Amino acid sequence: MIAQIPFWQRKRLADMTQPEWESLCDGCGKCCLQKLEDEDTGEVYHTDLVCRYMDLDTCGCTVYEQRLKKVPGCTVLTADTVLSYHWLPYTCAYRTLAEGRPLPDWHPLRSGDPDTVHQARVSVRGNVVSEDSVPEEDWEEHIIHWIL
């Protein structure tokens, strides 16, 4: 009977296998947004600029297996650190489960369809551009507030 309960409802984040952990990612792409931090206040601002390695259609990483070598500052979420990333969006499955909330209906694990995150307009698809298209000195002009 316990096997009929989805793993994300019966396991703690720390007890999940690597494949289970990876499958929690809904593919929204929000963690790949470039962020700016105010040096005085520490406040983090999201931009509509994404990592150069994001596929703008699927919102997936084109170099996922090599991402940490190619992008040294790439975010690595773990069960121990997920809640320390205060900038993670409310919709993030890792944050959702860490806070004890259920996965939403549009999450691919619930819907069985990886496109539901896009259909629900939760992903960044259609709202972002590659960081390569904007000089870094102009990134402040790309601060957004629709992320949360």
Swiss-Prot record:
Range of residues in the leader sequence: none
Transmembrane feature ranges: none
Family affiliation: Belongs to the UPF0260 family.
Pfam families: CxxCxxCC
Alphabetical list of PANTHER family matching this protein: UPF0260 PROTEIN YCGN (PTHR37421:SF1)
Highest taxon of the lineage: Bacteria
UniProt-recorded name of the protein: UPF0260 protein Maqu_1608
InterPro entries for this protein: Puta_zinc/iron-chelating_dom (IPR005358), UCP006173 (IPR008228)
